[in-house]
Amino acid sequence: MSTSSETRETRETPGTSSGTAVGPTTSRATDQPTNQATGHAGHAGHAGHAGHAKGRDAGAPVRGTRLTLRAATLGRPDAAALADVDLDVPPGEILTVVGPSGCGKSTLLRTLAGLLPALTGAVEQDGRPIVGPAADRALVFQEDALLPWRTLLANVELPLAIQGTPRADRRKLAADWLERVGLADRARQLPHRVSGGQRQRAQLARALAAGPRAVLMDEPFGALDAQTRAGMQDLLVEVLRGTGATVVFVTHDVDEALFLGDRVALLGAGRLVAVRDVPRPRERAAHDDPARVALRHAVLTSLNT
């Protein structure tokens, strides 16, 4: 990392990959958010959403949001990925989305995020059209999106600073969230000084600190080893418990989809194949439960047809 004092600007929306120009611009020299990006997350999207929210305490409940697609065709004009999608995600649900590579999982997520407009049909949040990114829909991708020159604490503070949360308040909120994800002792570390799993924990804390009503996650644990991945799954369930946030979680791993989801959406052959309820309880020991085994078999069969 260069130590030059020249101003460098990186477009960064909390929880998005660093190459997505949908959020406010931050200056490495001043470390302050500016208003230069046309897609400022605090003002994008439809009216009535929490563009000026001031964050929330770790674990404090928020009101979830309803995400809806009706007769929606998704993708690029020259290459539609999904056709005639009807899907309703009620407030507070964890919907996992599973399917083979190239089936449109990420396209669906980016459409719900407001990064990619639908080609036809309706895409709505609480009955209003999604027309762009919004501060109350947080994004977490597999790629490391932490700003490398900011400590973990400062990274978690970033969306709160963008929202205008006073410095002392956002410092406390960020510290509380890092403690919640088990990183209190790493708060002053730079991202390159911690492991991949710890960076993903910090990204999760950053996504949730600002109190989003929806969290959209695109294979966030895909690059982690099996043991770290299982730990992150357990942590996600624990952190989300009682928050009220609506979650759409994309994965290619059927077992991950069944462990995390209240329902699982199956994509394949350019369409939404099915949406199935996942039996509970959500426990590792339930992996061999007959109902879970039957659902796993049905999901794999659907994906292979």
Regions found by a protein language model. Give the residues of each.
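Conserved beta-strand-loop-alpha-helix hinge in the C-terminal portion
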Residues: 270-297
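Histidine (H) residue identity feature
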Residues: 40-52, 171, 192, 252, ...
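ABC family nucleotide-binding domain
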Residues: 59-244, 248-255, 260, 266
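ABC-family P-loop ATPase nucleotide-binding domain
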Residues: 1-73, 305
